[in-house]
Amino acid sequence: MADQLSEEQISEFKEAFSLFDKDGDGTITTKELGTVMRSLGQNPTEGELQDMINEVDADGNGTIDFPEFLTMMARKMRDTDSEEEIKEAFKVFDKDGNGYISAAELRHVMTNLGEKLTDTEVDEMIREADVDGDGQINYDEFVKMMLSK
């Protein structure tokens, strides 16, 4: 995971890490974690912080060493990327930019992708993703659909 980071990112994370490693022992406490991540432009919730700590704090001692920290930051960045990708994909479908994907827009994109769909198939796809029943897909519904694949 951390091997996907550039040298520049690693040295940036090392710098931030050492700012909060007050006693220089190579570990930071879980309480300091939120401050470190925010200094790097991330904005984790308390719940996310707790989950990340639980995932990487192998010995459960409540502190995180630098390799654990790198793994965690790489994960966080990967998740952010996929969010951006979903936003971009939504824009491709939402031709008129009104925040909704209509049946016509869905049919148009699917046809361009080489998928010849009947009206019934398009309506079925809309129905499956259309949580609020308004006959079109909004961004939240699109995200749910993409993440449930």
From Swiss-Prot:
Binding residue positions for Ca(2+) 2: D57, D59, N61, T63, E68
Keyword Acetylation: yes
Pfam families referenced in this protein's UniProt entry, alphabetically: EF-hand_7
Keyword Cytoplasm part of the UniProt annotation: no
Keywords attached to this entry: Acetylation, Calcium, Metal-binding, Repeat
Binding site residues for Ca(2+) 1: D21, D23, D25, T27, E32
Listed Gene3D superfamilies: EF-hand
Modified residues (N-acetylalanine): A2
UniProt domain EF-hand: residue ranges: 8-43, 44-79, 81-116, 117-149
Sites where the protein binds Ca(2+) 3: D94, D96, N98, Y100, E105
Cellular component, GO annotation: myosin II complex
Binding sites annotated in the UniProt record for Ca(2+) 4: D130, D132, D134, Q136, E141
Molecular function GO labels: calcium ion binding
Note: This protein has four functional calcium-binding sites.
Similarity section: Belongs to the calmodulin family.
Function field: Calmodulin mediates the control of a large number of enzymes, ion channels and other proteins by Ca(2+). Among the enzymes to be stimulated by the calmodulin-Ca(2+) complex are a number of protein kinases and phosphatases.
Protein name per the record: Calmodulin
UniProt organism field: Paxillus involutus (Naked brimcap)
Species lineage: Eukaryota, Fungi, Dikarya, Basidiomycota, Agaricomycotina
Protein encoded by which gene: calA
